[in-house]
Amino acid sequence: SEVKMDAEFRHDSGYEVHHQKLVFFAEDVGSNKGAIIGLMVGGVVIATVIVITLVMLK
C-alpha cells in the first residue's frame, strides 16, 4: 500500500513533503521511545544488581 500511495501522489509535491515529514516524525518518536525503554530496562537491571550485591554483602 505504501508504494501505491507514493505512485498516486507523486505529482503532488506538497503531499510528498508532508508525507516525508510524517514518516521522519514517526521514526523520531519510535527511536526516542526505544531509547527510553532501553534506559528503563538498564535502570531496572542496575537496581537489581545493586540489591543483589547489598544482600550478598549482608
From Swiss-Prot:
Keyword Transmembrane helix in record: yes
One GO CC term on file: growth cone
Record has Metal-binding as a keyword: yes
Topological domains, Cytoplasmic: 58
Location (main, coarse): membrane
Listed InterPro entries: Amyloid_glyco, Amyloid_glyco_Abeta, Amyloid_glyco_Abeta_sf
GO molecular function, one term: metal ion binding
Keyword tags: Amyloid, Cell membrane, Cell projection, Coated pit, Copper, Cytoplasm, Cytoplasmic vesicle, Endosome, Membrane, Metal-binding, Nucleus, Secreted, Transmembrane, Transmembrane helix, Zinc
Binding site for Cu(2+): H11, Y15, H18, H19
Record: residues binding Zn(2+): H11, Y15, H18, H19
Post-translational modification (record): Proteolytically processed under normal cellular conditions. Cleavage either by alpha-secretase, beta-secretase or theta-secretase leads to generation and extracellular release of soluble APP peptides, S-APP-alpha and S-APP-beta, and the retention of corresponding membrane-anchored C-terminal fragments, C80, C83 and C99. Subsequent processing of C80 and C83 by gamma-secretase yields P3 peptides. This is the major secretory pathway and is non-amyloidogenic.
Stretches that traverse the bilayer: 34-57
UniProt-annotated location(s): Cell membrane; Membrane; Perikaryon; Cell projection, Growth cone
Residue ranges, Extracellular side: 1-33
UniProt site (Cleavage): D12, S13
A Pfam family it matches: Beta-APP
Membrane topology term: Single-pass type I membrane protein
UniProt-listed GO biological process terms: axonogenesis; central nervous system development; cognition
Assembly, per entry: Binds, via its C-terminus, to the PID domain of several cytoplasmic proteins, including APBB family members, the APBA family, MAPK8IP1, SHC1 and NUMB and DAB1. Binding to DAB1 inhibits its serine phosphorylation. Interacts (via NPXY motif) with DAB2 (via PID domain); the interaction is impaired by tyrosine phosphorylation of the NPXY motif. Also interacts with GPCR-like protein BPP, APPBP1, IB1, KNS2 (via its TPR domains), APPBP2 (via BaSS) and DDB1. In vitro, it binds MAPT via the MT-binding domains. Associates with microtubules in the presence of ATP and in a kinesin-dependent manner.
Stated role: Functions as a cell surface receptor and performs physiological functions on the surface of neurons relevant to neurite growth, neuronal adhesion and axonogenesis. Interaction between APP molecules on neighboring cells promotes synaptogenesis. Involved in cell mobility and transcription regulation through protein-protein interactions. Can promote transcription activation through binding to APBB1-KAT5 and inhibit Notch signaling through interaction with Numb. Couples to apoptosis-inducing pathways such as those mediated by G(o) and JIP. Inhibits G(o)-alpha ATPase activity.
Similarity comment text for this entry: Belongs to the APP family.
Entry protein name: Amyloid-beta precursor protein
Gene: APP
